[in-house]
């Protein structure tokens, strides 16, 4: 299980990303429309003004149950060992164990 502080930090980053999402998107559109280089530099300065943790690349996908940051399956939102345990216990609909 991940530490509670790391999970809270990730939630804080998600809130910041949602808050500044429109500002980042509009600044990127402005950069593509403006022809002069000096204006692009000014808009680029605006793009750097939001907090660093509001960037979408700072977000990390975590396991829904344990908070584990690695080996996550997007379809289920679970880490590998939790997914395996749930499938073996028949708690995930549509997931079957492989047999050949």
Curated annotation (Swiss-Prot):
Belongs to the universal ribosomal protein uS14 family. Part of the 30S ribosomal subunit. It comes from the Eukaryota. GO terms for molecular function: rRNA binding; structural constituent of ribosome. Its main location: plastid. It is found in: Plastid, Chloroplast. GO terms for cellular component: chloroplast; small ribosomal subunit. Keywords: Chloroplast, Plastid, Ribonucleoprotein, Ribosomal protein, RNA-binding, rRNA-binding. SUPFAM superfamilies: Glucocorticoid receptor-like (DNA-binding domain) (SSF57716). Coiled coil: none annotated. This is Small ribosomal subunit protein uS14c. One of its GO terms (biological process) is translation. Binds 16S rRNA, required for the assembly of 30S particles. The lineage of its organism: Eukaryota, Viridiplantae, Streptophyta, Embryophyta, Tracheophyta. Pfam families: Ribosomal_S14.
């Amino acid at each position: 299980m991940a530490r509670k502080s790391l999970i809270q930090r990730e939630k804080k980053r998600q809130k910041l990303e949602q808050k500044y999402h429109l500002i980042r998107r509009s600044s990127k559109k402005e950069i593509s429309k403006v022809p002069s280089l000096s204006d692009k530099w000014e808009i680029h300065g605006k793009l750097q003004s939001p907090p660093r943790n509001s960037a979408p690349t700072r977000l990390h996908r975590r396991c829904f149950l344990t908070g584990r940051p690695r080996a996550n399956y997007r379809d289920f939102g679970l880490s590998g060992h939790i997914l395996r345990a749930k499938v073996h216990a028949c708690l995930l609909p549509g997931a079957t164990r492989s047999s050949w």
